[in-house]
């Protein structure tokens, strides 16, 4: 009897209960109880079932393995995991050889991407067809957002195609799409992006729908249609490319037939009656290019152009130059070697200061072309003599006349020089009835030369002398020769030559603070550097020319730190092409005192140096003023203080210029507090007075702006804002006390799958704008928050 039972059991259904783990046909199996039918080549598993095969780990309450067909039937709390994905369901039929199957009442999860449905067909390693499906990339439950559809065909690492898609926020249905394609990978891929909603005073409500085109591995584009309720339909393009690891470029273009601009008061003020209130086509082009070439040269291009002068104010985030006096368009090729610099450069400018937004550009002066060749300081043979030279050739050109017909008006002690016009008014451009007048004859006493060619050559020789440790003396001599060619009769060629002698003395005192015993301790080096420089022109010759004004050549009051301002136009020394046309520091002593603090700290096993503190005080004394005539005697220059502090949580960069004879201080100062989280607070001051030697300062005409910026970062909310306060608002006849402002709020609901960005801003003199954008994380990779620099793009 015992023998009969033994034979019967072991020929029908062998029992492995005594051995709960086994390996069959490359499959590792473990369960509370396991039965195998060798004839049918099946195995019945029950209780804490675990199956491992080719990187897949399968768990269930019960399973039936079909060894002949390489399939497994799983029941109850089924979970299939591999290195990338997890499959969970009530019941699963799996072809473990081909990695296909059917999942009932389950879901598939890859990272934070989850698909769930009543029936999920696994058609490949990462391909699924889901019925009565839900899709989300949120990590929370219930999910912040999801798409439900009758059918979803998904390829993990590719796309999901959803039929009858319904967007839900939480359980609430929001929008229905008949068909939707969403990306399931973080790689660049073509597809529609989420729409953006905007509203502005002039444009009205607007909705834009962008399409991202992944052209190749090194180029892509965003094509966008934006429909304004008041302006009309606008097309936008942004094309980006990379040419090599260090070379890239981008092209931005936009165009619309603007109906709202047709009613603009400024535009219609200058238009003929027959054209008033007619819509016009508006556009912009912005292009940036940087290319490192095989010969070691660098090709750069910067193009910024718009159809009208008001475009940057109406669309400040497109041209990115609202408030600038000119649009600069520049193309250059530069090549630097160990001791030389060579460049070919061309700059085309668009004058943005006209009253008429459709004004021409004939009065703008361009630099086309400009050639530079410089040789850096290098020893002469084996001696201590060092030489250097600079050569600059530039052609100044424009579409209009070679000179400006000018006239003057005097009121009290103030003389104003301005273009001759039919109204004889310095503010003639504000009146559309006023026109410029050209009499066809150059008047050297008042007219202004605007075009010509300049060749500038300057060799220099130095002889550094080390008197002691930390004490250096550097005598220098340079010769400068400049040739001008003007398109003006009787004033066609001008030459200027001079010698400059300089003597610089510098003392460096330093001390190291901190732990000097440990080799990897943090240390600080404090340097105090007093220095004195004397500059003199022992020989100077210059041809008489109205280009340099009517004042005495030897009395020109320029120093190297004086900038060109509008006040120069009416001065006795006129205004030239640029700063290089000035002769400065004729007999000048400059004294400076510099303090520097440098930190040395160790990052891992590598030393890191950074300058954490810098303070420089400088002032000059012009000895040549003693020999000048006139009633103005102001030999001391402004006292300049430059402060630069860069700590982990505190930064400031400030420049102060105190003018002793006017008793006022120009300031440009920024103070910033921040932490490691990304939160910050910043205050910036810009204060500028118009300084005229010998005259009192009109404080009511000053520019004094305070800019306040702050940023707050938290788990669910990011906030940052900025506004500019005009401290001189009460003394102005027009303008707002708050000149411009912007704030950005980013809401981050739970689940790391959605950014809701709200932007509210107003540029100086422009519209109030609202912008709302939803940034969904379809691929499961959370989006980074906007950096604080984003505020700078809103046309302050």
Residue ranges and their predicted role:
Residues 17-132, 146-149, 153-154, 159-164, ...:
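N-terminal amphipathic/hydrophobic interface segments
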